[in-house]
Amino acid sequence: MTIYRTGALRVVSQSILEYTSAFVLVIALYVLSCLGIAAAFAFLVWGVSAGQRLRTDIIGVHAITQIAKYLPTNTLHLVGRHAVLRRRGLSDAALLGAGLSEIVLLLLAAGGLAALGASDELATHLDLDQRFPAIMGAVLAALALIAAAALRVDRTVLVSPFLTWRAAAGASVAISVYCMFFTLSGVILWVLLAQAIQVPVPPDIVRLTSYAAISWSIGFVSPGAAAGIGVRETILILLLAGAVESAPATSAAVAYRLVTTLGDLITWALAGIWWWARR
């Protein structure tokens, strides 16, 4: 109802026609970030697979199966990915370890960036000499969470494969990519607000990155929400409402969903072409 009441669909439709280049840019950024997520998973599998080379076919499988997140339960992409890669010779242990690491590190990257965004917002209400300690405190808290999660994973999932330099290297690459993924999401939101929706003074990219991370996380853990549809938009509108008016906040959330859906379809198509070319 909010979408229709605020005229968000009409605004987004007009924006696509008037600012096509902006939409092309943000969709390209999203596709790039999706491929980065797929590459990160390949590094995680490499990290927990002793003697295994870095396999590029994992990137293609990840990109193809990811489209299944739009089906009910929001878990079929994980199941499908595991099944396909298992048939391609990877062990259950490696796939389960990499899959768990992916979930933990994604949520930690999101939590860390959300904390940074919160500290940035808090800093606006603090004196200059208090801002740096507030931001550094958030950074240290995020690093502590990452370290704690790494230890937790090491102790609970097939201990030995995770206690290697390969696992550390794979996890380091992955969490760096995940941080970049959420940062690009913040950039996408900024471009949509500033260029497509034409908000005079949009929130800064640090804050938008934290909003994207928070909405993604809640959508991810919400049971049954296919690709977080509905949940992420609701959270994003609530977060943006504190910085912009309700109508542009709703329009931005709708535009962001459109960008991510089209981006997922394009990623799936590109991966499908790659897969066909390899046959």
Language-model regions, residue ranges each:
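Membrane-interface alpha-helices at helix entry/exit sites of multi-pass transporters
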Residues: 55-60, 74-79, 86-103, 244-255
